């Protein structure tokens, strides 16, 4: 399993309207990873998106200190069974996905995440319904806000 940017942001920020379901999912995913019931991977593209959003004053009036943002990721990575996903050769999958689905603009980042998920065999957890068009249902957990 791997969390999308929106799940990381929501789980991290107690003031986020989706904090409770995101935190519940993330805590359970960490527990399952620690018990060997599931894997939990953090992708570089989602971690950088998380850092970009939580430190952006155009998104949050009260941005989070970068040390806290990095500390959140570090705390996840320190849990047994949680790993930082190594780069994969997702380009051919992303290219094909963008061409067949005519993906452009804001969905390009989502296409990269989807391609990485497909390539790695992971399951993505997100609030973002756009992924229903990018990923097969067995590789997608769509949380309800």
Over which residues does each language-model region extend?
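Active-site-proximal, substrate-binding regions of enzyme catalytic domains
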Residues: 54-81, 88, 92, 97-99
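Aromatic- and histidine-enriched alpha-helix N-cap/loop-to-helix transition segments
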Residues: 42-48, 108, 112
């Amino acid at each position: 399993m791997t969390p999308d940017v929106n799940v990381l942001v929501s789980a991290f920020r107690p003031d986020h309207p989706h904090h409770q379901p995101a935190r519940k999912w993330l805590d359970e995913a960490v527990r399952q990873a620690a018990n060997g019931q599931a894997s939990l991977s953090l992708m570089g593209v989602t971690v950088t998106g998380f850092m970009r959003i939580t430190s952006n004053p155009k998104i949050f009036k009260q941005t989070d200190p970068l040390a806290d943002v990095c500390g959140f990721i570090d705390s996840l990575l320190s849990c047994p069974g949680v790993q930082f996903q190594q780069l994969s050769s997702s380009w051919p999958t992303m290219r094909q996905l963008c061409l067949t689905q005519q993906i452009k603009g804001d969905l390009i980042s989502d296409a990269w995440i989807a391609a990485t998920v497909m390539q790695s065999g992971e399951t993505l957890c997100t609030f973002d319904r756009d992924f229903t068009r990018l990923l097969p249902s067995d590789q997608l957990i769509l949380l309800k806000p």
